[in-house]
């Protein structure tokens, strides 16, 4: 059946590749179909916040504009690492976690699992990404699970009301959060929706590197 054909193909793929590319598969062997950039290249789906999810028709220019922006602003550089956990069916994750990263030669690790705080923390520790691109919901969950239990302790609330000591504590919390996200990122970019003002205010207070 079809499964047997797939298994046979996988077993023979090395032999077939050597036969087709005796000098090895090189960048010159990659040939893309030439299409005008005003053609629809992709259907990306909205989150459905204003009703049912909608398929948005994106042209080559739409995608190229995002990638060009990412390259010109130096979001990512060749050899850096990215942990991709946003849906690639949405424009945000697709444009920056995948297309821009691929264009500049960034190493992309696909999470492949539902991004619960526990799974994300483990992945951040392993990958240590240089840039984190996310949505408010993910960051708010991390705040709820990592930060809130700490700052809601009675002793911590008391200490945060003492001048000078509060800044030292905020610095420690900032380091704890940065370390929890891999410790190597230059910035966390949060977009796609409005973030909880409580989380935003706290991040500004501890001088967390986000935008």
Locate the predicted segments by residue.
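Conserved pre-ATP/AMP-binding loop-to-beta segment of ANL
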Residues: 21-45, 52, 75-81
């Amino acid at each position: 059946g079809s499964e047997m054909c797939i298994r046979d193909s996988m077993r023979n793929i090395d032999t077939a590749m050597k036969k087709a590319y005796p000098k090895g598969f090189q960048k010159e062997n990659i040939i893309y179909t030439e299409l005008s950039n005003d053609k629809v290249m992709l259907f990306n789906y909205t989150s459905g916040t204003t009703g049912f999810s909608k398929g948005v028709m994106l042209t080559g220019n739409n995608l190229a504009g995002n990638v060009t922006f990412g390259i010109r602003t130096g979001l990512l550089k060749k050899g850096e690492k990215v942990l991709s956990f946003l849906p690639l069916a949405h424009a945000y994750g697709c444009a920056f976690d995948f297309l821009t990263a691929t264009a500049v030669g960034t190493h992309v690790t696909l999470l492949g699992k539902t991004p619960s705080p526990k799974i994300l923390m483990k992945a951040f520790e392993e990958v240590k990404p240089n840039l984190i691109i996310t949505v408010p919901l993910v960051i708010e969950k991390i705040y709820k699970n990592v930060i809130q239990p700490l700052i809601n302790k009675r002793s911590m609330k008391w200490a945060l009301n003492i001048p000078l000591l509060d800044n030292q504590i905020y610095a420690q919390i900032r380091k704890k959060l940065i370390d929890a996200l891999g410790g190597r990122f230059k910035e966390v970019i949060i977009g796609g929706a409005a973030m909880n003002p409580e989380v935003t205010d706290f991040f500004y207070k501890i001088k967390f590197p986000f935008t």
